């Protein structure tokens, strides 16, 4: 059985009166992509910051490659690479100069550093832009240089905190492909995201985090068993008209994102607003669809289209919390 490279036990972090992380425990196995999936504000970045020794845990412990947190931050930092959510580059420097800066922070220099910079630029597909200033790069290219910086010192575990936020779809696909290639090359990755599809496409295992608690953990197949044979109806709404109509009918999402409009319909288990959509978990899509469509029409909702989906991680999150992932 594969051994864990990371073990977290009852990690907690409090900022004043706010308990951002509430005693989470999990492990990451060597050679896997482990995703922490949850909405913004769930505690993902705070967890990464504790595990990368940027902030001290209020309680609990962790171990990375045999090194203790708290207590052995120097060796932990040597064992990990970090790709932060915020781009950490100097726009006035070239890609190579930025990587030279980060390499020196890892006590790298001379020919070994120069060779390693060539290697990581090739990994992220930017060898031909090495001499260009970062200010000329797109958001996606900057993200890739951030990843290159995290790989410079050959870490045993790579933390990637929401690395595709705010970039175009093509750059996003390229980064996801890169993450898979890193795993296939033996890298262990702890990946945080609020995009359900990223967690589904990348992960060997997923931990679902919400309001500072780890509420579920397992493979995608294991997690979707939570909802059994449920299916999902995804109603795509026109933006302005639907929001106004929901409010006018008194059916606006509650504080936790739930929608009461479809309560009581045969086969409906739960419903929540997600962006400009309503996600309805049902026991059987074929049986529930006429009632859901009828109720939407009666309410005057502008439904542009309806998708029928098999159980996925968003359905699991909705089942466990009553809210959509992006509420």
Locate predicted features.
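ABC transporter nucleotide-binding domain
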Residues: 176-283
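ABC transporter nucleotide-binding domains
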Residues: 3-8, 13-216
